Regions:
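Conserved N-terminal phosphate-binding loop of PLP-dependent enzymes in the Aspartate aminotransferase
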Residues: 1-290
Length: 290
């Protein structure tokens, strides 16, 4: 196999994600033969640094020996098992370890397939909870301007990046948006904390007026990644947690990108000293292995 041959085979059978395939008529695909640590190697022996961590996923390096050996050992014992009516030791051990690391107040783990599915589960669980409480008018969600929460229809409904959602607008449910506390939008001389407090007024007003129909607020804590790494002050999360408690609304923390120490604390929510009602994880949870 060589680079050119694999590129030909690829273009004959694959559509790549987040890609205009016509671009690859002029811009070659990078074919990779193997990887180790941060290095990717093509079929001609040229090496590349995986600086995007394969889309923010690979936190332990490619072909990590410890992980490789653990997976090989597990494959000889049990490769997969339905969790409806069954259990196994690895899933219980993982759940125990995750809960020990998570903000205090989170008590159960639920597993889905990927990040978008994690968001879908959180949205559904929130609505289901309120309906079980007799609060059947609660069917709406709130997200921030510039938010990104995934590519499936429910996740796209709480996403505010037209590049991803505009084409499918007629399929999406209508949700509430409030201005982001992204500090790059702050006037000169305004501190990140002051701007976050100012921007929170719109959220407070919406929750005060519409909380009878709102299930949850969903946010990317501290950093809105797909919007361009837009950052905001932790005080916004503190104010949001208090307001969600005040108005009877869930708080969903989408830490799919920022979880697992990417912001300096193990979870970004820890910098605000809050516990969300739902904590959505993916990416670094499996480091791309599973």
């Amino acid at each position: 196999m060589n680079n050119h041959r694999l590129m030909q085979r690829d273009l004959a059978v694959l559509w790549h994600p987040c890609t205009q395939m016509h671009d690859h008529e002029q811009i070659p695909i990078v074919p990779i033969a193997k990887a180790s640590g941060v290095w990717l190697t093509d079929f001609d022996g040229k090496r590349y640094v995986d600086a995007i961590s394969s889309w923010w996923v690979n936190i332990w390096g490619h072909a990590n020996p410890h992980i490789n050996n653990a997976i090989k050992e597990q494959l000889d014992t049990l490769e997969h098992l339905i969790l409806a009516g069954f259990s196994h030791e690895p899933i219980v051990t993982l759940s125990e370890k995750l809960l020990a690391l998570a903000p205090k107040g989170l008590a159960r783990c639920f597993y889905a397939d990927n990040g978008s599915a994690a968001i879908e589960v959180a949205l559904k669980m929130s609505m289901h909870f309120w309906h079980n409480q007799g609060e059947t008018a609660k069917t709406r969600f709130v997200s921030l301007s510039g938010s990104y929460h995934g590519e499936t229809l429910g996740a796209l409904s709480v996403t505010d990046i037209p590049l991803f959602s505009q084409t499918y607008a007629s399929l999406l449910t209508q949700q509430y948006r409030v201005p982001s506390p992204d500090w790059t939008q702050a006037p000169d001389g305004v501190t990140p904390e002051a701007f976050a407090r100012q921007q929170f007024l719109a959220m407070e007003t919406l929750l005060a007026e519409k909380h009878p129909e709102i299930c949850a607020v969903i946010v990317e804590p501290l950093i809105q990644g797909a919007a361009g790494m837009k950052m905001y002050h932790p005080v916004y999360l503190q104010l949001l947690r208090a307001a969600c408690d005040k108005y009877g609304v869930h708080l969903i923390a989408d830490e799919i990108a920022v979880g697992f120490a990417r912001t300096g604390t193990f979870f970004a929510c820890e910098q605000a000293h809050i516990c969300p009602d739902f904590l959505c994880l993916s990416k670094a949870l499996t480091a791309g292995y599973l």
